[in-house]
C-alpha cells in the first residue's frame, strides 16, 4: 500500500513530468551550446541556440510522424498544431503544481528582470549575479512551458507577442508585466478557443492555427 500510493500519484502526472523533464533537458542543451560558443549567457546567443535546437527537434518530430502508423498520424499532427478540445479540470489539476512552481520562480525575480532589461552590464553594477538569476528564470519558464505543452501542445504567438502588448499598456515594470501577461494571455487563449470552435462548426480548428 505504501508503494502503491506514490505510483498512483506519479502515474497521473506522467505526461506532464516527462514534458517538463525534456523541457529542462532542452534548456540544458541550449545553455551548453551557449557556454561553448561564447562563454557567457548573452540573449542573442541563447535565442540563436534555441532556434537551432528547435529546427533539430522539429526534424525529429517529422521523422516520428513518418514512422507512425497511418491511423495515428492525424492525432500527432493535431497535437503539434495545439488543441484544448476535450480538456477539463482533470488536466488543470495535472498542470497546477507546475504552474505554481514556475510562476513563483519568475514572479519572485521581477526586480532582477527589471535590472536585466537595462542591460546585463548595468545589472551587474547593482551586485546581481546575472548568470545565476538568468538560469533560475529560464528554469521557471521551462517548467511552465513543459506543463502547458503536455496538455495542449505547442501554442504559438501567445507567449511571444502578448508580453510585448502588455508592456505597451502597463509599462516596462515586470512587477505588472508578468501578472497582466498571465491574465491577458489566458483571456486571449479563451477567445481564440471560442473562435476555433465556432468558425467552422460543427468541426473545430486547431487553436494554434487561430492564435498564429
Where are these regions (language model features)?
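Alpha-helical transmembrane segments in inner-membrane proteins
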Residues: 1-212
Amino acid at each position: 500500500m505504501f508503494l502503491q500510493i506514490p505510483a498512483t500519484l506519479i502515474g497521473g502526472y506522467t505526461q506532464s513530468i516527462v514534458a517538463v523533464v525534456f523541457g529542462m533537458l532542452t534548456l540544458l542543451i541550449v545553455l551548453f551550446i551557449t557556454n561553448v560558443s561564447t562563454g557567457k549567457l548573452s540573449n542573442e546567443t541563447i535565442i540563436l541556440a534555441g532556434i537551432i535546437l528547435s529546427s533539430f527537434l522539429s526534424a525529429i518530430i517529422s521523422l516520428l510522424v513518418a514512422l507512425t502508423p497511418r491511423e495515428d498520424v492525424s492525432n500527432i499532427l493535431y497535437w503539434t498544431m495545439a488543441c484544448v478540445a476535450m480538456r477539463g479540470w482533470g488536466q488543470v489539476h495535472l498542470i497546477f503544481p507546475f504552474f505554481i512552481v514556475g510562476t513563483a520562480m519568475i514572479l519572485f525575480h521581477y526586480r532582477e528582470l527589471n535590472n536585466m532589461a537595462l542591460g546585463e552590464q548595468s545589472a551587474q553594477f547593482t551586485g546581481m549575479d546575472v548568470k545565476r538569476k538568468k538560469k533560475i528564470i529560464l528554469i521557471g519558464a521551462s517548467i511552465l512551458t513543459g506543463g502547458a505543452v503536455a496538455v495542449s501542445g505547442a501554442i504559438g504567438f501567445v507567449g511571444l507577442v502578448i508580453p510585448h502588448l502588455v508592456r505597451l499598456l502597463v509599462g516596462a515594470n515586470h512587477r505588472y508585466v508578468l501578472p497582466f501577461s498571465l491574465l491577458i494571455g489566458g483571456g486571449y487563449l479563451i477567445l481564440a478557443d471560442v473562435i476555433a470552435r465556432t468558425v467552422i462548426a460543427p468541426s473545430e480548428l486547431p487553436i494554434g492555427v487561430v492564435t498564429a
